[in-house]
Amino acid sequence: MKMKNIITLRDYIQQAEKSHSLERKQIIDLLDSNNPEILHQLCLAAGRCRRRWLFHETQLVCFFDFGEEAPDADGTERLILKAENAGFSKIILKRKQGDDFQTALWQHIANRCRQRRMQLILSLDKFNLTDINRLKDSGVYGFRCEAGTFNERIYRRIHKSKTSGNFSYLLKCLENIHDCGADLTIGFAVGIPGTTTSDIASDILYLPQLRPHNVEICRFSPEVDETLALKSIALVRLLNPRVTLTASPVLCNLPEAPFLEQLLAGADTVATSVMLPSMLSEICFHIKACGFTVNRDFEK
């Protein structure tokens, strides 16, 4: 890459940090750059932006995926109690595929979380505004959607959706979640087969329309270059300075680097299924080694 182009890209980064806005072509140019200096400058700018708007605190939240298990009231309540005892004040529950959220079970779980003053986030793949309002009234704090993308063609391919109505209704629901007073967490992936940096740029620019409280960015598969995810995280931070950004989940053992690199790229939240005090202490140690503090529940 010519020096003139590097200087231009640095100007883009300065513009993003100052005005929190970029044009689509500028985002594409930054994503396409293979110069490590550009990644470094992006992460530095995103880190400054995070500290300016969200200070140094990193939030630890509990994440539990039921997978194919059918959740029951007693088991879920034990999980909530275990998370509370570990120090978590927010818990994300991801339901199994096809599970029905219109049952009294989930309203019961939401009520139990509210009684314990824990914030419950439900991860959904199908949205219905009536159900969302009912669950919100039961005590659900927010909703999480792993859309993957906001491009209808790509969405229908990765979710095997046969009708455009599903996609249109999903966007309508997401755009209205904020109005019902619930938090909205949006997840999208980079490196989806058949996509380009132009598609990623479009997803990044679409985010403000959904007014999310939290954004999760991940690689579509382990084979996708982590650099692309780091750049995307940094750009979302620069263009959306007030949003919270979640790093890759820590699901069992500590990963070698990803979530720490993502914190340095602008993420401020770590989701984990780890509840052992010794492992939580290790996660907190690494977060502090990056120059951040941890939410006070884990400073006891």
Task: Provide a role label for each language-model segment.
Residues 76-80, 106-110, 132, 171-174, ...:
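Generic structural signal for well-ordered alpha-helices
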Residues 21, 26-81, 85-91:
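N-terminal [4Fe-4S]-dependent radical SAM core
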Residues 1-37, 84, 116, 208-300:
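Auxiliary Fe-S-binding modules of radical SAM enzymes
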Residues 93, 142, 168-246, 273-274:
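Conserved C-terminal portion of the radical SAM core fold
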Residues 67, 71-75, 79, 83-173, ...:
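Core AdoMet radical
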